[in-house]
Amino acid sequence: MQTMEGRQYNYQDSINASSSMVVPHSPWHSPVPYLFGGLAAMLALICVALLILACSYWRLSGSAERDLEAGDDAKPDNDTNKTKHTEMPEKFLVIMAGDVRPTYLATPATRSEQSCTCGDHNEEEGRRG
């Protein structure tokens, strides 16, 4: 027995008391489960995103083979699919910028060779002379 600061201290009693009060150590007090749980959640999120991308690509490639708007529900032959391409006219949208907000939307003007006399020098010489 030892005396510490006026008190008696029995070293063997403290060892026996501490060994009898063993508190079970929970694995959730460590950061390791949270680390692996976060990594697993990120990996699952990436897998779900890749699965969605693959399904949307598969669905888009399947719809390109048949034309639903034309009423062709069955898959067409490869020969007829190649000859049915129709060209759509190109559409342009020009926004004329202003100081605060756009001033107006530009409308495309059709050019015809008869109305354009920009490069015709014969008419200019005829007017002058």
Curated annotation (Swiss-Prot):
Which of UniProt's keywords are assigned here? Answer: Amino-acid transport, Membrane, Transmembrane, Transmembrane helix, Transport
What residue range is the signal peptide? none
Q: Give the highest taxon in the source lineage.
A: Eukaryota
Segments in the Cytoplasmic topological domain: 56-129
Gene Ontology BP terms: amino acid transport; regulation of amino acid export
Against InterPro entries, the record matches this protein to: GDU
One Gene Ontology cellular component annotation held by this UniProt entry: membrane
Transport as a keyword of this entry, yes or no, is: yes
Compartments in which it is found? Membrane
Q: Which stretches are Extracellular in the membrane topology?
A: 1-34
Task: Name the major location.
Answer: membrane
Q: What are the Basic and acidic residues biased-composition ranges?
A: 120-129
**Region: Disordered, residue numbers:** 66-89, 106-129
| Short sequence motif VIMAG: positions | 94-98
Q: Where are the transmembrane segments?
A: 35-55
Q: How does it sit in the membrane?
A: Single-pass membrane protein
Q: Which tissue types show expression of this protein?
A: Expressed in the vascular tissues.
State the family named in the UniProt similarity comment for this chain: Belongs to the GLUTAMINE DUMPER 1 (TC 9.B.60) family.
Could you share any additional remarks the record makes about this protein?
Overexpression of GLUTAMINE DUMPER 2 leads to free amino acid levels accumulation and plant size decrease.
| Purpose of the protein | Probable subunit of an amino acid transporter involved in the regulation of the amino acid metabolism. Stimulates amino acid export by activating nonselective amino acid facilitators.
Q: What is known of its domains?
A: The VIMAG motif is necessary for the function of the protein.
Name the chain's protein.
Protein GLUTAMINE DUMPER 2
- Organism from which the protein derives: Arabidopsis thaliana
